[in-house]
Amino acid sequence: MDSDFGIPRELSPLQQLRSQYKPELPPCLQGTTVRVELGDGTTVAEAADSHTMARAFPHTLGQPLAHFLRETAQVPDAHIITELPSVRVGIVFCGRQAPGGHNVIWGLFEALKVHNAKSTLLGFLGGSEGLFAQKTLEITDDILQTYKNQGGYDLLGRTKDQIKTTEQVNAALKACTDLKLDGLVIIGGVISNTDAAHLAEFFAAAKCSTKVVGVPVTTNGDLKNQFVEANVGFDTICKVNSQLISNACTDALSAEKYYYFIRLMGRKHSHVALECTLQSHPNMVILGEEVAASKLTIFDIAKQICDAVQARAVEDKNHGVILIPEGLIVSIPEVYALLKEIHGLLRQGVSADKISTQLSPWSSALFEFLPPFIKKQLLLHPESDDSAQLSQIETEKLLAYLVETEMNKRLKEGTYKGKKFNAICHFFGYQARGSLPSKFDCDYAYVLGHICYHILAAGLNGYMATVTNLKSPVNKWKCGATPITAMMTVKHWSQDASYTLTSIGRPAIHPAMVDLKGKAYDLLRQNAQKFLMEDLYRNPGPLQYDGPGADAKAVSLCVEDQDYMGRIKKLQEYLDQVRTIVKPGCSQDVLKAALSVMASVTDVLTTISSNGGQ
């Protein structure tokens, strides 16, 4: 019911305490002046996509990075915006809820009112459907009171549908025009921010004055690139999951007779599973990216687990905890091929009960082998973005079933001499994504909300609010905005076996995989054998808001060497210094030295670029 949105919440004592917490702002966002420096124009993420991207985004491709600066910054090219008229801004939750989302609204609202008290913030009720239907709620400080630093998306509600069809895009344009919006802020993950980029281009082509801004909010942690270090919600969901996992570890160690198979929400890629492993130290984690890279079959994975169970039994350890990302199932080559066939037949209108008779021989053989509960789940209709309904596919139960079958066989044959194998299965996701947000997510979301205002005040369209150097304290965060087109790529795939016919996908932000050459994965690999055999279980405990642990951040964030925006800014400063020193009239020695150094730098950068930046 629309009337339920925005009503005051009943708050527990802890929630009341959290609602009084005021997140800190970095120095560049403090005060009442907007100072923005626009850098060089951005390039496409993949050179091969240049032509397709140029055709898709003639108005918004190649826009510059924006850096927001503190009021006292001595930057001659910075644009200082002092005239800040009242504006009307719409904001909408798209995609699944993530802890901290409400603080984006709070941060934007505060920035609007600080710079001009007459500005208006309208929340669209029920996500994108509310946008199309122009169902709005005017955000006020009274309405926000019981939603500050709180979880969920229940202030406005949400949808997970895309803004993609011609009808939907036109409805969004009409809503923004009818409501006289100066800006539209879209909160979501890779799909929602892809839609934001296309919407910004459509608005620009239609000469609509509404500027579109995206905000990286998703528990999956897969909206990652050089510009985006973390997503709002990821920190919280990993900390909550890690406590639950650690509790299971303690239980397993106490009873010494159960293996816990725990599947973690996180869509196709394994960022949540990797981070939770680094925080809680379970015995095993099966990352989808490892499986895909090694082309492991479902039977290979089951054998890996069985061998681990047998090795632990030799050490008189008949218990353990195994983490499984929900996207593992689509990383297994033969299962992925089966799902593609099933989805193709469903799109053709074939009923679920007749699909098994129309599968190819290989897929049919696999399908018939699978237990009935998995068959039923694989036959579910795909999501709106054509992906499988991963949260509904109980991969943990499938693996537990296969492992139990094999261990019983080994027990009978005498090759396994441990206790009878007992599995307990769990799926963690819904329990965590509605949690109170962590201190980090509260701060990060609030800052992103403020940045959204600065983007709109600077008149920028098709940008994402970004913060880098996140592993440092808030006062060292670098705030800016990146054209969403700079994060987008185009998928190409073959339509036939000869590879002569290829299809080109819609330009999109594609989910980032776990980097198997990254420092977070390397940390896992260094410790994997110890985690497997030594029961080094670690319990981080519940979310902390004060004292030890309150300022802890994701391990995968802290081990990486990032701050791309800060380094781009530093490079720009060096180049400016070079231009100041080396100009007509400088000495021959200065000119020769500059040429020599620049030639060497160019050679090194050309070599690195040709190797794909590795």
Swiss-Prot record:
Activity regulation behaviour: Allosterically activated by fructose 2,6-bisphosphate.
InterPro entries, per the entry: PfpB_PPi_PFK, Phosphofructokinase_dom, PKF_sf
Induction of expression: By sucrose, glucose, and fructose.
KO phenotype (gene knockout): Retarded growth and reduced pyrophosphate--fructose 6-phosphate 1-phosphotransferase (PFP) activity.
Pathway: Carbohydrate degradation; glycolysis; D-glyceraldehyde 3-phosphate and glycerone phosphate from D-glucose: step 3/4
Record carries keyword Cytoplasm: yes
GO molecular function list: 6-phosphofructokinase activity; ATP binding; diphosphate-fructose-6-phosphate 1-phosphotransferase activity; metal ion binding
Subunit (UniProt): Tetramer of two alpha (regulatory) and two beta (catalytic) chains.
Function: Regulatory subunit of pyrophosphate--fructose 6-phosphate 1-phosphotransferase.
The protein's name in its UniProt record: Pyrophosphate--fructose 6-phosphate 1-phosphotransferase subunit alpha 1
Organism, scientific name: Arabidopsis thaliana (Mouse-ear cress)
